[in-house]
Amino acid sequence: MEQLKILFLCHGNICRSPMAEFIMKDLVRSRGLQDCFLIDSAAVTTEEIGNAIYPPAKRKLYEKGIPFDDHRARLITKKEIEDYYDMVLVMDISNLWYLRRILGVEPGPKIRLM
């Protein structure tokens, strides 16, 4: 079975997108569907690259019992968007603007604004 590859994008990949990634992974795992999905997150800007999840975000995941790993912020690439992910969920309109700059064109149908 081919996995549906879902990517969450936000500004720095230290708060919203990794939280969405780990919440979605937990939801999928709780339903026994982890083999059906590949879930990831990334940033649309470079300023937080290499940084860990924002401590208050990490604390909230812990409080809610949502497992997370030693995530480090990373920058999305045009190639990943075009050739790898099936669905890209962008956190806000500003992130969509940055994504347009990365892609060099208007985002296609696999891009969704949350």
PLM feature segments, named:
Residues M1-Y84:
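Conserved active-site segments centered on acidic
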